[in-house]
Amino acid sequence: MTGALPDGADRRRAAYRFGHRAEWLALAALMLKGYWPIGRRVSVAGGEIDLVVRRWNTVVFVEVKARAKRDDAREAIDGAKRRRFSRAVRAWIGRNAWCAGATFRADAVFVGHWAWPAHVERVFTIEGL
């Protein structure tokens, strides 16, 4: 049987590809600002961290949000997302003893179609640190 996938599957696949490209764009933007990548799509017991980067003695955990309009992406980080993100960060820190003396920060990069990624530092406080 051949043919196109159902509309829902097409939309999910397109959204996945858009999110994947957004993460690469976000990483490129951060590297241009002097951040060095440590991990991408890091899976830990608490969840997933889109990007982990480092600049000097600061380890930055980055949530990448991609929407058609960049301003819509800012609204996508709610309380539940913050709790899951914080849980994942704590699990990551527990597995990486080398960063014991580092400063930690939670940033976000918002990506929209045809717009340069917007990097927002300290988008929220990491719970439990």
Swiss-Prot record:
Entry superkingdom: Bacteria
SUPFAM superfamilies: Restriction endonuclease-like
A molecular function GO annotation: nucleic acid binding
Matching InterPro entries: Restrct_endonuc-II-like, tRNA_endonuc-like_dom_sf, UPF0102_YraN-like
One Pfam family here: UPF0102
Family membership noted in the UniProt record: Belongs to the UPF0102 family.
The protein, known as: UPF0102 protein Mrad2831_2938
Lineage: Bacteria, Pseudomonadati, Pseudomonadota, Alphaproteobacteria, Hyphomicrobiales
